[in-house]
Amino acid sequence: MNNIQLLKTEATIPYSISLLRKILMDTPGMDEWDETNKHEVIEKFPEEGGIIRVIEYLFIKFPLMMDNRDIVQEKKIWEEYNGNEHNCLIISKSIEHQSHPPQKKVIRGEMILSGIYLKENKIGQTDIYMINNVDLKIKTGADLVNKVAKKKPKEFIENLTKFCKKCYKK
């Protein structure tokens, strides 16, 4: 059975790319709104050539009777300003990192490729296109997990939107 999941979604939300980028790059703050994963910054690099680079550890809590998963990933962010257009691309993929080797009782998943593309369509509105290609190394119960996984991108956008609304009120 193929365990690789291709998950995708798109949405338009009434918040600026600047706010979304700030929230999506605040790795520890993501725990406040992304209920699926626990996030930790392993390493953050100085901006180089307009690219921001971060190494993150994600811990994914699974239902009872299933082993939890984790992923170490590199995240890169590009921003582009062309006149009135503002775009942002966030790409993540799995890597190995000496500070976070695989653990016993936690299965190391693989983020084959994850991408979020943000495109400003009007002042204060952003189109979000999101795609994840992930292998969580599931052997049993894969059908159930796959059903749940298909809902995750939409939940991610909903939680992000709620958090933006909360931040915007501040």
Named regions from a protein language model:
Residues 1-170:
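Eukaryotic helix-grip
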